Amino acid sequence: MTTMEQRRNQNAVQQQDDEETQHGPFPVEQLQAAGIASVDVKKLRDAGLCTVEGVAYTPRKDLLQIKGISDAKVDKIVEAASKLVPLGFTSASQLHAQRQEIIQITSGSRELDKVLEGGIETGSITELYGEFRSGKTQLCHTLCVTCQLPMDQGGGEGKAMYIDAEGTFRPQRLLQIADRFGLNGADVLENVAYARAYNTDHQSRLLLEAASMMIETRFALLIVDSATALYRTDFSGRGELSARQMHLAKFLRSLQKLADEFGVAVVITNQVVAQVDGSALFAGPQFKPIGGNIMAHATTTRLALRKGRAEERICKVISSPCLPEAEARFQISTEGVTDCKD
């Protein structure tokens, strides 16, 4: 092989590596090539901004709150980030092409997947709400396993991250579900990053740690079970309602940023409260999800779960930008979420 051919092959390999590098989030360290000092880049990372996308999506006033980052430095950082991350208009055809790359993670039930048009969508927030024993946590356990499957089997070929606010996560359930899909149980457990959240501030701080982990390895799924449980205990009474909703809105915005930056499927469970009015005397109490309009607007897809006969559960699509309102029946067994056996 001639020297010219060797150089041509090296250039081709380099170009391929560059294309692979540019696919996905940019590490925040790439801002150094745009003239940002390494000490300032470290301050950004310490503040939880691990990607250039994360910097570009962050409001200017939040960047100013980072210790040691002056007004002039913020302008320079924002300018450098905007050159690497396109934030302007794009055509609908380009957006349509990008949407074709979105992955759906199977729920474990073919009937439920049919209603969801493939499964749980990556790059967005899916909310599961319902009363206790409606199947929310069991669906989350199943997704922790199915997200590790190959894409041609309905998986996401990535790891799962589980933030547990209620103490209901059980690793042995993952082992049972892994057997069903023919996966090695030890590998499945190793690929699930688990954290217990103890208060709302801790729950928010865990998202900063999540971002630093996602930049290092591929995660396909982030679960918060439940997103609202700690808000019901940390904030009490109408006097703290405004503070609770502001804190919740910021937490949900951080979840959406992770979905945008890393393309993970974000699944949150939500508790419900009985809505007692005059009609409840005749039709029984109606349940509504916690969080009000802030939760409703922050989630992309909203699914309501309720109990059926025995182990049967019903999932209803409440709101979605692309899914019609529909219902699906599924069953909870030792193997996780499965189709009903009529």
From Swiss-Prot:
It is found in: Nucleus. Keywords: ATP-binding, DNA damage, DNA recombination, DNA repair, DNA-binding, Nucleotide-binding, Nucleus. Residues 100-314 form the FtsK domain. ATP binds at G130, E131, F132, R133, S134, G135, K136, T137. Gene3D superfamilies: 5' to 3' exonuclease, C-terminal subdomain, P-loop containing nucleotide triphosphate hydrolases. Induction: By genotoxic stress and by DNA damage (gamma-radiation, UV-B). Regulated by ATM in response to DNA double strand breaks (DSBs). SMART domains: AAA (SM00382). GO terms for biological process: DNA metabolic process; double-strand break repair; double-strand break repair via synthesis-dependent strand annealing; mitotic recombination-dependent replication fork processing; regulation of DNA-templated transcription; response to gamma radiation; response to radiation. It holds the Pfam family Rad51. One of its GO terms (molecular function) is DNA strand exchange activity. Residues 1-24 are annotated as: Disordered. Residues 51-80 form the HhH domain. InterPro entries: AAA+_ATPase, DNA_recomb/repair_Rad51, DNA_recomb/repair_Rad51_C, DNA_recomb/repair_RecA-like, DNA_repair_Rad51/TF_NusA_a-hlx, P-loop_NTPase, RecA_ATP-bd, RecA_monomer-monomer_interface. One of its GO terms (cellular component) is chromosome. Detected in various tissues. Higher expression in reproductive tissues than in vegetative tissues, with the highest expression level in young flower buds. At cellular level, is expressed at low levels in flower primordia, then at higher levels in young anthers and at highest levels in both females and males meiocytes. Not detected in gametophytes. Belongs to the RecA family. RAD51 subfamily. Self-associates and interacts with XRCC3. Binds to RAD54/CHR25. Interacts with BRCA2A and BRCA2B. Can form a tripartite complex with both BRCA2B and DSS1(I). Binds to single and double-stranded DNA and exhibits DNA-dependent ATPase activity. Unwinds duplex DNA. Component of the meiotic recombination pathway. Seems to play a role in mediating chromosome homology search, chromosome pairing and synapsis at early stages and probably chromosome crossing-over at later stages in meiosis. Probably is involved in the repair of meiotic double strand breaks (DBSs) generated by AtSPO11-1 and in homologous recombination. Its function is dispensable for vegetative growth and root mitosis. This is DNA repair protein RAD51 homolog 1. It comes from Arabidopsis thaliana. The lineage of its organism: Eukaryota, Viridiplantae, Streptophyta, Embryophyta, Tracheophyta.
